[in-house]
Amino acid sequence: MQLLDVYNDAIRDCTKATALVNSTNEFYNNSVVSNGTVYSTDIHSCVIDGAFLTLFMAFERFLELSFLCYMMGQPGLNGNTFARFVSPVNEENALNMIKGNNKFADFTNRDIIVRLANNFFDAGGTYTYLNSISGDFEEMKKIRNAISHVSIESKKSFQGLVRTKIGSLPPNIDTSTFLNMIVPGASTTFFIHYKDIVVSAIGNISNP
């Protein structure tokens, strides 16, 4: 596994997610009908939610796989390196080091990622960049949880996020509607806002 491949896969998934949102907006706004089937609000919402999950999982996968690449001593895309404090014999050994006594390593938890990075890399390598987007990362997790979970707590967390971001809680607002809203004071949607954050993070982490 090479960091360049990990990077390209992540960027490709981000691009795919964006294309899905663009396509569903085009179909929905033009009331597309095929063989009597209308491109409904439900279909539109499912596609947007699915696109966001694709984006989030692309970032999660990138964080884990890039971490393994750096543990194996690979340089960044720019050729720069940083010191590592471990020398795993292979990727499986590296993954076991990350997991420790746990069943898996949670690469959706910024605190865990940064702690591991500080344990394994000099000054945390490039993963300290996550500290600069800690708030955005948590917001994305709240949206992810609201899409994939049905708990009262995940719904409350999402509603709190909506209030914080737009100053009110529109009746019956769901994740897809929020993601398709224009960010106050900006010209892009919340989906594009989070996509840009992910792409920027991928680039920064890939280039020490």
Language-model segments: residues:
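Intrinsic-disorder-associated interaction segments
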Residues: 3, 7-13, 87, 106, ...
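Short, flexible helix-adjacent loops and helix caps
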Residues: 26-29, 33, 67, 71, ...
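Charge-enriched, short contiguous segments at helix-coil
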Residues: 33-34, 38, 42, 114-208
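Exposed alpha-helical structural elements
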Residues: 16-19, 23, 112, 136, ...
